[in-house]
Amino acid sequence: MDAFAIKQIAITLTLILALWSGSTSVLSDEIRVAVASNFSMAMKAITAEFETISGHQVVLSFGSTGKHYAQIINGAPFDVFLAADALRPTILEQQGVAQSNSRITYARGKLVLWTSKPETQRINESLLNHQDIRHLAIANPKLSPYGIAAQQVMTNLNVWLSLQTKLVRGENIAQAFQFVHSGNAELGFIAYSQVFNPESAVRGSFWIPPQSLYSPIDQQAVLLNDKKASKDFLRFLEGSLARQIIQNYGYDLP
């Protein structure tokens, strides 16, 4: 084989490799998703299914809705935002930071009052006034919609002011859960999805406040760019498989 033929083969192979690598990058994009802490377990399950089906890689960042919102308006490179409320996605859309008409309500959350102590068989709102309760964990209402819901419940039960010295505020609902789980707080207002976990039983007891005591926790998602992979992910989130997973983790569907 002469030198010219060898050169032509080398050029052809180079072109094939370039086309292959280019098509691979199109088919398997990376999607960066900011997710409210309460939705972490459900989101991991949804992501595993989506990655298998789509070939895309999803990078998850969990935290409080308020903190994620601040990061996004300051230029954090997220593609999709799954909030624990409808307010921040709405504001992002109004500000032009999020894609117009891309907001969806993906889940409706529920609040519970939880103790991890196994000896506590039954709890209800009366336990909030118990003198043995020294610490009550909540997510910070300034950052977390679940913290706002907890404040609303206590306000409507007329105990918000009397419990101020006992409150331990977590940056997000996951931290509020850890305060109770570790024993640093006897009680805590957390997300129902954190105790209704299909993967592992959570010890202790909980009380579900009537939803008349707090505003509905409608959790919305919004696109932060028009990447096809981002749109594919949001479309998957609305699909039957994702919705079944969401229900399995204790959420109501919109």
Where are these predicted regions, by residue range?
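Active-site acidic carboxylates
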Residues: 101
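Low-complexity, intrinsically disordered regions enriched in charged/polar residues
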Residues: 7-9, 25, 122
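Bacterial N-terminal signal peptides
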Residues: 10-22
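Exported/periplasmic ABC-transporter solute-binding proteins
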Residues: 27-53, 59-62, 66, 70-76, ...
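Bacterial N-terminal signal peptides that target proteins for export
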Residues: 1-13
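Polar low-complexity intrinsically disordered regions enriched in Ser/Thr and small residues
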Residues: 5, 23-25, 207
